């Protein structure tokens, strides 16, 4: 269904729907979301209620609303989706995935970008607070089912200092012991496919569509549930997974890095 077909006859503009579908904005009125969902064929009461809750949280009610003014474009909406997801599949080629990061790693990563992003020390601390809050979905009741593929480069790129990296390796080893986490590593020496940018596939249950999130150049977030994009990124994830080390070899790989750095 095209954008024109979705909004035809609805009190929603094409540009507004486009921004919402990309995760860069949100409908200001709940009834507009419900109308769009009906047009898209989402009518199950539980499904609609779930999406309305996420939408409302993205606007004001979620814990992240306290930080929304300091978040990049679309990030508050993404955090709302992440908080409501049942499962995620992630690939990171450059940095350790945010949900796996230690507080020290987060702070060092934000600080390194300070001259480029022209951020303040206060905004860095708020960014760290947000990421630490987001990590709670890994250990909450009914925790997120997280499957991650980390490139070796993301683990060898030194963020902060060797001491920060050692603690980060140990944190990943600890998290890998959780039943709801599956962490694989793609070694540099493996002759296989690599995606140049990170992405996250988010699943909400059988009756709701999977969405894929990609970071934008300005630090924002782009989200889509287009079938063609979900197929493309699912295929990429599957190929990356097949090229990575088996899950059981993750602790040894990381322990070797602890000794080497």
Question: Where are the model-predicted features located?
Answer:
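C-terminal regulatory/effector modules of DNA-binding transcriptional regulators
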Residues: 142, 149, 156-261
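Short acidic (Asp/Glu) and glycine-rich catalytic loops that position anionic groups and cofactors
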Residues: 16, 30-34, 211-216
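Base-recognition residues in the alpha-helical recognition helix of bacterial helix-turn-helix
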Residues: 19
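Interdomain hinge/linker segments and adjacent boundary elements that couple functional modules
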Residues: 3-9, 22, 26-156, 225, ...
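Short glycine/serine/threonine/alanine-rich loop segments
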Residues: 1, 12, 181
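Key DNA-contact positions within bacterial/archaeal DNA-binding proteins
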Residues: 4, 14-15
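Short Asp/Glu-rich motifs
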Residues: 15, 56, 195
